[in-house]
């Protein structure tokens, strides 16, 4: 309400001021063509409203279409992201299973290698023991053969020294008689 009271006061001050300085506000509406100006202004607003309204409507439709397209792309991207997250989770599960299987397989292989190594060690120990026993038997045989050879040599030398030609003839005759009895 204060503004309405002030407007006539402002108009009065301007009209008084204009008469003194040759510039001012003409308060006669018909003389100042205020009605024509108002009609022109309302006509412009009406025409511009229709023109700008159609432009704004077209712009609004484009903006809404762009927003809808963006929302659709967002939904598609969200769906792809969700699918990718599912695939990542499945891949992670598969990776974990592969790791577990690899650990189990590595444990089995390690156990198998250790068991095979233990068997190889036992077999080598048995083979080594067998080789040692065989070597001992061969050495004993060689020693026995050497002892037998040396004993025979000694006996032969003693017999040659102690045996006379008469004893030799008796042994030969005795052997011939034994052979004759067998035939």
Curated annotation (Swiss-Prot):
Per UniProt, subcellular location reads as: Plastid, Chloroplast thylakoid membrane
Keyword presence, Kinase: no
Q: How does it sit in the membrane?
A: Single-pass membrane protein
Q: Which Pfam families match?
A: ATP-synt_B
Molecular function (GO) terms for this protein are: ATP binding; proton-transporting ATP synthase activity, rotational mechanism
InterPro entries named among the record's database cross-references:
ATP_synth_b/b'su_bac/chlpt (IPR002146)
- Write out the transmembrane intervals: 28-48
Q: What is this protein called?
A: ATP synthase subunit b, chloroplastic
Role summary: F(1)F(0) ATP synthase produces ATP from ADP in the presence of a proton or sodium gradient. F-type ATPases consist of two structural domains, F(1) containing the extramembraneous catalytic core and F(0) containing the membrane proton channel, linked together by a central stalk and a peripheral stalk. During catalysis, ATP synthesis in the catalytic domain of F(1) is coupled via a rotary mechanism of the central stalk subunits to proton translocation. Component of the F(0) channel, it forms part of the peripheral stalk, linking F(1) to F(0).
């Amino acid at each position: 309400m204060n503004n309405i009271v002030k407007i006539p006061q402002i108009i009065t001050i301007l009209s008084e001021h204009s008469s003194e300085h040759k510039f001012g506000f003409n308060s006669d509406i018909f003389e100042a063509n205020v009605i024509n100006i108002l009609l022109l202004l309302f006509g412009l607003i009406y025409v511009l409203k229709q023109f700008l309204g159609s432009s704004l409507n077209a712009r609004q439709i484009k903006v809404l279409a762009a927003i809808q397209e963006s929302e659709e792309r967002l939904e598609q991207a969200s769906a792809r992201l969700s699918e990718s997250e599912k695939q990542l989770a499945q891949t992670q599960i598969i990776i974990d299973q592969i790791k577990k299987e690899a650990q189990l397989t590595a444990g089995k292989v390690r156990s198998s290698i250790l068991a095979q190594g233990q068997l190889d060690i036992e077999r080598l120990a048995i083979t080594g023991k067998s080789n040692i026993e065989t070597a001992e038997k061969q050495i004993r045989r060689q020693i026995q053969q050497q002892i037998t050879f040396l004993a025979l040599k000694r006996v032969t030398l003693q017999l040659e020294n102690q045996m006379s030609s008469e004893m030799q003839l008796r042994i030969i005759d005795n052997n011939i008689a034994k052979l004759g009895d067998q035939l």
